[in-house]
Design a protein with these regions (language model features):
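Hydrophobic core segments of alpha-helical transmembrane domains in multi-pass membrane proteins
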Residues: 26-36, 87-95
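Mid-chain, well-packed structural core segment of small domains
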Residues: 62-96
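Hydrophobic, membrane-inserted alpha-helices
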Residues: 8-17, 70-75
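Juxtamembrane helix-capping/reentrant segments at transmembrane boundaries
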Residues: 48-67
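Short hydrophobic alpha-helical membrane-embedded segments
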Residues: 1-10, 63-69
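Membrane-proximal cytosolic segments adjacent to transmembrane helices
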Residues: 4, 97, 101-144
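Helix-coil boundary and interhelical linker segments in multi-pass alpha-helical membrane proteins
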Residues: 15-27, 78-87
């Protein structure tokens, strides 16, 4: 009985690995960005004297799992609808953008440099209002 269950499980696992193989590069880049966001977030929290709790770390892991699920579901929908359009790459691009924005926010807190604030201002379309970006960043750090 156990041999049968083991063979079924191994076959199902092999099918999943083969089915999602085209997404490995997207998931690898996503994982690198999430880890970079996590590391810079820890440094930013320490700089802002904010406690690092297991709840916040759990939030990061859940966020990463939700990102992976969103990309894989988009890929599955694309395959099921037989689209010749890589829609999952657009979903991944949006998620990459969110993670890169979060990394820049953390770097702005860590470095106290105007360079990252200017980049954030351009991304958010508020390049003339640097004080507004700094206030929003301070407000976000207080919320964490």
């Amino acid at each position: 009985m156990w041999g049968f269950l083991k063979s079924v499980f191994c076959s199902a696992w092999g099918f999943c690995v083969a089915y999602f193989a085209p997404t490995w590069h997207v998931l690898t880049i996503l994982s690198i960005l999430v880890v970079a966001d996590w590391v810079t977030g820890i440094f930013a929290s320490r700089k802002a004297n904010i406690d690092i709790t297991s709840r916040r770390l759990t939030h990061s892991v859940v966020k990463w799992l939700c990102y992976i699920t969103a990309i894989l579901l988009t890929f599955m929908a694309e395959q099921a609808l037989t689209l010749e359009f890589n829609f999952y790459l657009f979903a991944a691009g949006y998620i990459y953008g969110c993670e890169i924005l979060s990394i820049f926010e953390n770097l702005a807190v860590i470095s106290d440099s105007d360079v990252y604030l200017r980049i954030l201002a351009v991304i958010r379309g508020k390049s003339k209002d640097m004080a507004g970006v700094k206030d929003a960043l301070n407000e976000e750090m207080k919320g964490k």
